[in-house]
Swiss-Prot record:
The lineage of its organism: Eukaryota, Metazoa, Ecdysozoa, Arthropoda, Hexapoda. It catalyses: Preferential cleavage: Arg-|-Xaa, Lys-|-Xaa. The keyword Transport does not apply. It comes from Lucilia cuprina (Green bottle fly). Keywords: Disulfide bond, Hydrolase, Protease, Secreted, Serine protease. GO terms for cellular component: extracellular region. It is an enzyme of class 3 (hydrolase). This is Trypsin alpha-3. It is found in: Secreted, Extracellular space.
Amino acid sequence: NSGGVLVSVAAFKNHEGYNSKTMVNDIAVIRLSSSLTTSSTIKTIGLATAAPANGAAATVSGWGTTSSGGSIPSQLRYVDVKIVGRTQCASSTYGYGSEIKASMICAYTVGKDSCQGDSGGPLVSGGRLVGVVSWGYGCAAVNYPGVYADVAALRSWVVSAANSV
């Protein structure tokens, strides 16, 4: 509720291959109307060049609800999760199967997840942006990891779009 910086968006670019039915390429780039000054609460982050290993520690943050149908929090929240590799996420261990595509990465820890309102937020692992909150079945549903746009897989598009938006 306090201490933040409000900056308007000057322009944005959605991935041309985004599909709202399959959620493939669920990523966009924004250009702010003014520059941000780095500080103790505003920092830059590098883009992942490779997907983190299955089981790697990660953190997702956002302003979303803390449960399905819940209310929006007054403070930025975060939760620690573990990376679930694409092959494992699409396996029979979890409930998604073929819905998991090459432009997606998953993260799961029992009882912890991103939720409504977190979409577009960061998934960070190893000090790099590895994912962008995309979709999932409910929030923290058993055997349904959170699904994220895979930054490493989409990195070349992000870099190109950032230079042209």
